[in-house]
């Protein structure tokens, strides 16, 4: 039985090096999908590059942990900037959910303004949409808009009946031990679970000054090498996977 594999590169719009890496991994590798940060410093560059790559499916990378929000978020920002203190607020059950809802709508409308179409799907920077307080908001919004959502089904959330998502999701292709064998192990693990559709998250990039400031820096370049490996596409096909995007879900 043929299974669907979505290889999604996060962080489109983060920097020019990130953008170029994603485009390279699409043109000469196995990346089929990406998600864009509409408040990223290189989002206009990402939009420009995407016009020459119509096969690349583009979703929205909802941002609540970096940069400036599009709306006033006094309950989540410090000095007007978003940050990782969102985890502390979540633990204290003090998230400003109405502000988050308004920001989600604003980022979605900004995406359409930038790219001229709806995103293929939604996910989020640092997986914040999987917070128990935030997931119902994002899942309901995705279902209402008729777009798909990255969802880790191993987390016990109720999904709206009309929400499109993959059966499996993996963030395991990440870290200091990136290799082709690791990527294929992710596929084999999904096969053993019986997943008929799978999204694998990745972050291929060329290194620039912005990426050098990231805690996750040089592995992005290693990811790019693996994802453009001449042998990987054949190994994927041998395992019964067809490369696709959330358009196919």
Curated annotation (Swiss-Prot):
Per the entry, induction is:
By N,N'-diacetylchitobiose.
Its GO CC terms are: cytoplasm
List, separated by semicolons, the cofactors it needs.
Mg(2+)
Annotated effect of mutating residue 11 to A? Unable to induce CnbR and to grow on chitobiose
What if the gene is knocked out?
A: Cells lacking this gene are unable to grow on chitobiose and chitotriose.
Instruction: Give the record's pathway.
Output: Glycan degradation; chitin degradation
Instruction: Tell me the residue numbers annotated for binding Mg(2+).
Output: 61, 125
Q: What class of enzyme is it?
A: hydrolase
Q: How does it assemble?
A: Homodimer.
Q: Which family does it belong to?
A: Belongs to the YdjC deacetylase family. ChbG subfamily.
What protein does this entry describe? Chitooligosaccharide deacetylase ChbG
Read off the lineage from the record: Bacteria, Pseudomonadati, Pseudomonadota, Gammaproteobacteria, Enterobacterales
